């Protein structure tokens, strides 16, 4: 055989192989490549959506944290105000209680002073009557004595 005939036969076999490959082998390979490219594109799109969803979730979490911090600081401020109010009320109650106790003590002292004065008046009246009786050495009438005591009490 001649080199031209062999070359021609190889060319025919080559083109036959190319035709067979293009007709029967290439379409399933191209279809598989297209499907894989679609899956990769879909995966990339899903990753992009996931990334944007993650960023949105981070923003929302940051907002919720800020809101939570604000609420906590507000609660702390309210608690501090309430504590200050309770302390102020306790001070006012203690002050009014102290004033009440002082007034009661003053009233008790005045009452004891009044009792002491009355007792002293009675003792002075008794002493005056005894002194007058011893000076006069006479018997005094009981009704006159009572009148004298009352008069003396009133004068003292």
UniProtKB/Swiss-Prot annotation:
The keyword RNA-binding does not apply. One of its GO terms (molecular function) is proton-transporting ATP synthase activity, rotational mechanism. Keywords: ATP synthesis, Cell inner membrane, Cell membrane, CF(0), Hydrogen ion transport, Ion transport, Membrane, Transmembrane, Transmembrane helix, Transport. It is found in: Cell inner membrane. It is a single-pass membrane protein. The chain crosses the membrane at residues 7-27. GO terms for cellular component: plasma membrane; proton-transporting ATP synthase complex. Pfam families: ATP-synt_B. It comes from the Bacteria. Disulfide bonds: none annotated. InterPro entries: ATP_synth_B-like_membr_sf, ATP_synth_b/b'su_bac/chlpt, ATP_synth_F0_bsu_bac, ATP_synthase_B_chain. Gene3D superfamilies: F1F0 ATP synthase subunit B, membrane domain. F(1)F(0) ATP synthase produces ATP from ADP in the presence of a proton or sodium gradient. F-type ATPases consist of two structural domains, F(1) containing the extramembraneous catalytic core and F(0) containing the membrane proton channel, linked together by a central stalk and a peripheral stalk. During catalysis, ATP synthesis in the catalytic domain of F(1) is coupled via a rotary mechanism of the central stalk subunits to proton translocation. Belongs to the ATPase B chain family. F-type ATPases have 2 components, F(1) - the catalytic core - and F(0) - the membrane proton channel. F(1) has five subunits: alpha(3), beta(3), gamma(1), delta(1), epsilon(1). F(0) has three main subunits: a(1), b(2) and c(10-14). The alpha and beta chains form an alternating ring which encloses part of the gamma chain. F(1) is attached to F(0) by a central stalk formed by the gamma and epsilon chains, while a peripheral stalk is formed by the delta and b chains. This is ATP synthase subunit b. It comes from Neisseria meningitidis serogroup A / serotype 4A (strain DSM 15465 / Z2491). The gene is atpF.
């Amino acid at each position: 055989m001649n080199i031209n005939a062999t070359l021609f036969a190889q060319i025919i076999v080559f083109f036959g192989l190319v035709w067979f490959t293009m007709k029967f082998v290439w379409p399933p390979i191209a279809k598989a490549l297209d499907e894989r490219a679609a899956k990769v594109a879909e995966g990339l799109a899903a990753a992009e959506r996931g990334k944007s969803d993650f960023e949105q979730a981070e923003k929302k979490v940051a907002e919720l944290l800020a809101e939570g911090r604000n609420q906590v600081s507000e609660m702390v401020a309210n608690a501090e105000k309430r504590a200050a109010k309770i302390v102020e009320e306790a001070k006012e109650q203690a002050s009014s209680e102290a004033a009440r106790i002082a007034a009661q003590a003053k009233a008790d002292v005045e009452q004891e002073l009044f009792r002491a004065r009355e007792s002293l008046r009675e003792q002075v009246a008794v002493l005056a009557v005894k002194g007058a009786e011893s000076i006069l050495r006479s018997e005094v009438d009981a009704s006159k004595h009572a009148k004298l005591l009352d008069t003396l009490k009133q004068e003292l």
